[in-house]
A protein has these predicted regions:
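Bacterial N-terminal signal peptides that target proteins for export
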Residues: 2-12
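N-terminal signal peptide c-region/cleavage motif recognized by signal peptidases
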Residues: 21-22
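Cationic, glycine-rich low-complexity segments
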Residues: 28-160
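Amphipathic interfacial helices
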Residues: 95-148, 171-234
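Membrane-engaging insertion elements
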Residues: 140-161, 241-281
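Acidic-basic catalytic patches of nuclease active cores, encompassing PD-(D/E)XK
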Residues: 265-350
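Conserved catalytic cores of phosphodiester-cleaving nucleases, focusing on short active-site segments
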Residues: 323-384, 388-393
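Domain-level recognition of nuclease-like catalytic cores that cleave nucleotide substrates
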Residues: 396-426
């Protein structure tokens, strides 16, 4: 037999086997994620209000909705319903600060103190761990009296990888934490101002973040408090995260103390030091979201898989991914408290629970799920086979997705409340 004939015969044999195989893929019909009217996704109160309106046509990507907010203070993109709530809630704060910046007292304070935005400080607030090594040469030039405490802060942040996380956390607490409380009055002013405005001091909104920088620096350098009053709070203005406001920690605790608190909590969960370092150093997690993730995970203490969940979170590549994982863990906490206890976290691409009855529990903080190849692959996951499967979504499924999930044996729960009913003191 000629070589070419043998190759052709081998190819045909493989092709026939594939066609006859019971696991051979069959043609499947998928959806193109639609553009939807905004009112089908969110309540009217989030679509228009004092100084803002949301574009009526909202593109979706198969999981999330992408909103455009047009306002008197700029145009903002929100790549999920959660981010829409947050960004809409920040607009009154931006408007209030705009108004206050024109007041006589503020203008005089700026003139006397030549207060300017602090670029390095603003970066540190948004990504505290990622930029802490640049503190003495960055923010340090504005606060010359940091002195020895500032040098120890740098040492704590640049400790060799082999140093125990507990040792680094303790040193960080006794040096950097005290320095932040006593010397970084700027940071304290920023948190206090954010609390007055009911916004996240670690917001990634560039407009609001810059305003918080300007006002906090003015108040710190002029020794004059900035007082604001928001007359109208739009729905969602307290939505620092989709799951719940992170108690009052993000407002009342110095940044360094929050970092140490998170480190210690992860150590108590027996997360390896190298994983803690990778997670704490991931710049896509705003400190508020990082704190929420750790707080939620702590409520699942003792359940196998928590370490793997932190490992996965350390690989998040965007704020949207960070919030998704944080909210998913928060929803698992709610299920654990109100439905059936979770006995294990299954961490393979996502953070999924298995409850005491053996059911697979998928908590999905998504907006609108279309039946795409990606969603189909997830719904057909072989490691879910043989178990009762439930999926809980904060948003909704397309009709095709709903039908296909149910046909595959999934129990579907849509538009669930993601807020865990937990005691903040736990």
């Amino acid at each position: 037999m000629k070589a070419s004939t043998r190759l052709l015969w081998n190819f045909l044999s493989v092709l026939i086997l594939l066609l006859l195989s019971p696991t051979a893929p069959t043609a499947e019909r998928f959806e193109i994620p639609p553009t939807l009217p905004a009112q089908t996704l969110v309540p009217a109160s989030l679509l228009s209000g004092d100084g803002f309106r949301v574009q009526q046509q909202v593109p979706t990507d198969g999981l999330m909705a992408h909103f455009t907010i047009q306002s008197d203070v700029g145009t903002f993109q929100a790549n999920s319903i959660e981010m829409l709530r947050i960004r809409v809630g920040e607009i009154p704060a931006i408007m209030e600060l705009n108004k206050t910046s024109k007041s006589k007292v503020f203008v005089q304070s700026v003139g006397r103190n030549a207060a300017r935005p602090v670029q390095a400080a603003g970066q540190m607030v948004m990504h505290p761990v990622d930029t802490v090594t640049g503190l003495p040469s960055g923010v340090g030039r504005f606060f010359g009296r940091v002195g020895l405490a500032g040098q120890k802060l740098k040492q704590a942040a640049t400790e060799p990888e082999g140093a125990p996380a507990g040792e680094k956390a303790g040193q960080f607490a006794t040096t950097a934490g005290q320095a932040t409380r006593n010397v970084f009055g700027y940071e304290e002013e920023r948190r206090h101002l954010a609390k007055q405005l009911h916004v996240d001091p670690y917001t990634t909104n560039p407009v609001l973040s810059k305003q918080l920088d300007d006002f906090a620096l003015t108040a710190f350098r002029a020794h004059v408090g900035v007082t604001t009053t928001i007359g109208v709070l739009v729905p969602g203005s307290m939505a620092i995260t989709a799951t719940r406001v992170v108690s009052t920690w993000v407002w009342d605790k110095p940044k360094a103390d929050l970092i140490v608190q998170n480190q210690k909590a992860l150590q108590q969960l027996l997360v390896p030091d190298r994983v803690i370092k990778a997670f704490m150093g991931n710049p896509v997690f705003p400190l508020s979201v990082q704190t929420e993730f750790v707080s939620n995970l702590k409520l699942l203490s003792g359940i196998p898989g928590t370490g793997e969940a932190v490992t996965l979170a350390s690989t998040a590549e965007s704020e949207e991914q960070a919030r998704f994982l944080t909210d998913a863990v928060g929803m698992l906490v709610r299920y654990n408290d109100t439905q059936t206890p979770i006995t294990r976290l299954i961490v393979r691409r996502a953070i999924i629970g298995r409850d005491r009855n053996g059911a697979i529990v998928v908590q999905a903080p998504v907006d609108y799920v279309s039946w795409t190849a990606l969603v189909s692959t997830f719904a057909h996951r072989s490691d879910f086979a043989g178990s009762r499967r439930t999926i809980w979504l904060t948003g909704q499924l397309s009709p095709m997705s709903r039908e296909n999930f149910r046909t595959l044996g999934w129990t579907v729960n849509e538009k669930v409340n993601p807020i865990p009913d937990v005691d903040e003191s736990r």
